[in-house]
Amino acid sequence: MSNYVVAMEAAWLVRDVENSDDAIGVAVSEAGKRLNDQDLDYVEVEAGVTGCPACGEGLDAAFLAANTALVGLVLELTVFNADSDEHAQRIAKSEVGGALRDVPLEVIDVIEDGDAPAEEA
């Protein structure tokens, strides 16, 4: 059994905001609060980055229209003692998905973590 770092992308809807910086701040705060309420404080929440189609430069993953924003968030956690990377993905989506109901989640990266000590089963 191995440990895996699983990164997921979440689409977070924020209403009544006037700029993308405010939308990102609200999205990160709300996601963090919902995760912490479910004792998932080990999940890291960050604003997502998307590449500019013209130049490839990284841009904040936030789209704003009519004072409503869709913010892309990156959620990252370590899954201990998983049988495979697919097993780690299922565990991560189950843990985070339970706290963030009705929030679309997609696994974007899974890395086997050889540095983290395995927890006792």
Curated annotation (Swiss-Prot):
Q: Which Pfam families match?
A: DUF555 (PF04475)
Which domain of life, per UniProt?
Archaea
What InterPro entries is this protein classified in? Answer: UPF0212
**Record family assignment:** Belongs to the UPF0212 family.
NCBIfam families noted in UniProt: PRK03922.1
Q: What is this protein called?
A: UPF0212 protein VNG_0879C
Q: Which organism is it from?
A: Halobacterium salinarum (strain ATCC 700922 / JCM 11081 / NRC-1) (Halobacterium halobium)
